[in-house]
Amino acid sequence: MAKEKVLTEQDSLRIIQEMIQKAKAGAHYERGQGPILWGSVIGFAGIMSFLEIYFKWNIPFDWWILTLVALIPQVFIVLNDRKKNIVKTHEARAIDMVWAVFGISIFALVLYGNFIGQITIQLLAEEDITLWKRSGTDGSLASFQMFVPSIASLYLMIYGFPTLVTGVVIRCRSMLIGACICYILFVVSLYTPTVWDMLFIGIAGICNWLIPGIILRRQYLLSVKTKHV
């Protein structure tokens, strides 16, 4: 029977430190990749939507389609983590689940915003109820299309949740500040029209993800550089 190797105290500490470093390197949000990606996309789409509505530009393109395009590099980020066989702590797994629930919630909100108006009209029609609006000029009546008021406010509220949790767990002050900005913008958006809500979403993407992502990326690259010195 082969003699088992006895680990010294120094060997044990070295192994523990290596495991911690692998766990830290495995979280794409700690490397800043995910936050930079989504902060850039949400920030750009929100600001461009605001400019298009405010200045009445006629651009035949939905800026929010960019969020679907961003799923492609996000998949590559996740697959790259798996290929490296990176060790994940319980905290990292919990944060991953928080972001997964966040993604599901955003998808549910998109469905809600796109379908609830028409579905409400159909349900009212089944009860023989029709909505009309009266013209302010000649007093004529026209059918009224149900809409969802200030759904952008709900996005702002949800945006802050995963960032706040992540910021608390990894002790990232910039994420905590970004999440607080999201909740402040949520409250302000309750009193503003949709055009300004689009601007708030763009600002939220920049403050909530892009800026913290850049800070995390710089810290990660500095730690890698220090490690190899």
What residue ranges belong to the model's regions?
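Alpha-helical membrane-embedding segments
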Residues: 94-105, 124-134, 188-193, 210-221
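Membrane-helix interface and helix-disruption motif detector
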Residues: 55-63, 144-147, 192-200
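Membrane-proximal helix-loop-helix units in multi-pass membrane proteins
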Residues: 104-175
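Hydrophobic core segments of alpha-helical transmembrane domains in multi-pass membrane proteins
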Residues: 63-70, 155-156, 200-208
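Selected alpha-helical membrane-embedding segments in polytopic membrane proteins
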Residues: 30-122
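Terminal transmembrane helical module of multi-pass membrane proteins
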Residues: 159-229
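C-terminal ends of transmembrane helices
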Residues: 22, 75-91, 161-168, 210-217
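N-terminal juxtamembrane cytosolic/stromal segments of multi-pass membrane proteins
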Residues: 1-32
